[in-house]
Swiss-Prot record:
PROSITE patterns: GATB. The keyword Transmembrane helix does not apply. The gene is gatB. This is Aspartyl/glutamyl-tRNA(Asn/Gln) amidotransferase subunit B. The keyword Nuclease does not apply. It catalyses: L-glutamyl-tRNA(Gln) + L-glutamine + ATP + H2O = L-glutaminyl-tRNA(Gln) + L-glutamate + ADP + phosphate + H(+); L-aspartyl-tRNA(Asn) + L-glutamine + ATP + H2O = L-asparaginyl-tRNA(Asn) + L-glutamate + ADP + phosphate + 2 H(+). It is an enzyme of class 6 (ligase). It comes from the Bacteria.
Length: 484
């Protein structure tokens, strides 16, 4: 039997406010435990929550960016459950009336464009954190501690429809969402610090069946690689379970990266288990059109619009434009390089950024912001390819030297110091060609007999004689001329 995987994602995006969603405590990461929790965060009697306007503005910005409906009136609700790091005994969230409804997000899986519909995005507070390895009793027995610094940190939970059909598609969506929230400046995107966490709802069904299978939820996956592995394992587990005559149980599961498996945490609750009801301490969040218009006026150019502009203004293929707009920093870098080149050379800039620059960044695990070769420096290097000073092959060596900081990272200085200027003198190139032809009469005869590989062999020997510095185009033209 052939099976289809059905995936929906719930992503907890930590909003980049300086203070918490309902209190004035700092959201700074890494402080000593319980030093950033005030009376509201600790749920002390008499303390009342006050809504953080900045969190609401970031939610509005996201809603506009995905084409969702920003609710003119949304309501905060109490989500009731017990957990040691939830001091109030409930979490303030949104249920029936979220701040954003609907919207879409488009992304690429390889070179195929996909679009996923969003169900909603709602504001809520984060819980605290249980610490299990840092404490022990006087007797030496293990103990747990609670750090409430994170309690009350503002989150925007973004929920998709169950429309994704592969782990690769889910990861591509998650990457696109991560890119968007960082692009908008509403989240720093730091997955190691928990700023962007995914819950994956996974089920399987026979191909062609309309009804969904029983889903499980994989909680708090904080890396794209682990997200893909967790979904693949869980789908495989469910298929094997059903084929062996078992039944999938609706439950919450945790992904264990060390064992590359999911394991059961608890039975999965339904909404009625949380006994949602409107929070009496918080008035409805009312968002007028003036507020929405003000947020829209401050929006940056969105990735989709920038992709379309790169295709129209620079003649880039859709795939290239998508790759160059994975982040605002990458898009700005490309545009700065392209603008410093002669008209019609933007594709060459794109090739270099998607090739040498991206490969080096990936190898060193750096972001484009940390690239030691600036956009202006890269443009200077590419201009030396365009004007024939160096070949594309030599340029790669120069780029590596620039990255390492040789000669201050200046392309011209490196070319001069290493004597890398391309030989473009037709007389000098012609003399080299004559020597190679004289030394290889058999290969010349093979070419004249119609063997194209013989021509390539001659070109290789000429370039070797020139130590890679001969202009390849001139070599090809003069060689053809001499061979007749």
């Amino acid at each position: 039997m052939n099976w289809e995987i059905v995936i929906g994602l719930e992503t907890h995006t930590q909003l980049s406010t300086d203070s918490k969603i309902f209190s004035g405590s700092s959201t700074r990461f890494g402080a000593a435990p319980n030093t950033q929790a005030n009376a509201v965060d600790l749920a002390l009697p008499g303390s009342l929550p006050v809504m953080n306007r900045g969190a609401a503005e970031r939610a509005i910005l996201f809603g506009l960016a995905v084409g969702g409906k920003v609710a003119p009136r949304s309501v905060f609700a109490r989500k009731n459950y017990f957990y040691p790091d939830l001091p109030k005994g409930y979490q303030i969230s949104q249920y029936e009336l979220p701040v954003v409804e609907g919207g879409t997000l488009s992304f690429f899986v390889g070179e195929e464009e996909k679009t996923v519909n969003l169900t909603r995005a709602h504001l809520e507070e984060d819980a605290g954190k249980s610490l299990h390895d840092e404490f022990s009793l006087a007797s030496g027995a293990p103990a747990s501690g609670i750090d409430l610094n994170r309690a009350g940190t503002p989150l925007l939970e973004i929920v998709t429809e169950p429309e994704m059909r592969s782990a690769a598609e889910a990861v591509a969506y998650a990457r696109a969402l991560h890119s968007l929230v960082v692009w908008l400046g509403i989240c720093d995107g730091n997955m190691q610090e928990g700023s962007f966490r995914c819950d994956a709802n996974v089920s399987v069904r026979p191909v062609g069946q309309k009804e969904f299978g029983t889903r499980t939820e994989i909680k708090n996956v904080n890396s794209f690689r682990f997200l893909e592995r967790a979904i693949l394992f869980e789908a495989r587990r469910q298929i094997e379970l059903i084929e062996d005559g078992g039944t999938v149980v609706q439950e919450t599961r945790l992904y264990d990266a060390d064992r590359d498996e999911t394991r059961s945490m608890r039975s999965k609750e339904d909404a009625h288990d949380y006994r949602y009801f409107p929070d009496p301490d918080l008035p409805p969040l009312v968002i007028g059109q003036d507020w929405i218009d003000a947020v829209r006026a401050g929006m940056p150019e969105l990735p989709a619009a920038q992709r379309a502009r790169f295709e129209a203004d620079y003649g880039l293929p859709a795939y290239d434009a998508a790759q160059l707009t994975v982040s605002r920093a990458m898009a700005d870098y490309f545009e700065a390089v392209a603008r410093a080149l002669p008209a019609g050379q933007a594709k060459l800039a794109a090739n270099w950024i998607m090739g040498e620059v991206a490969a080096t960044l990936n190898r060193e695990e750096k972001d484009i912001d940390a690239a030691p070769v600036s956009a202006a420096a890269l443009a200077a290097l590419i201009n030396r390819i365009i004007d024939g000073t160096i070949s594309n092959k030599i340029a790669r060596d120069v780029f590596a030297a620039m990255w390492a900081g040789e000669n201050g990272g200046d392309a011209d200085a490196i070319i001069e110091a290493r004597g890398l200027k391309q030989i473009s003198d037709s007389g000098a190139i012609g003399a080299m060609i004559d020597e190679v032809l004289a030394a290889n009469p058999a290969i010349v005869e093979e070419y004249r007999a119609g063997k194209q590989k013989a021509f390539n062999s001659l070109v290789g020997q000429i370039m070797k004689a020139a130590k890679g510095k001969a202009n390849p185009q001139q070599v090809n033209e003069l060689l053809k001329e001499k061979l007749g």
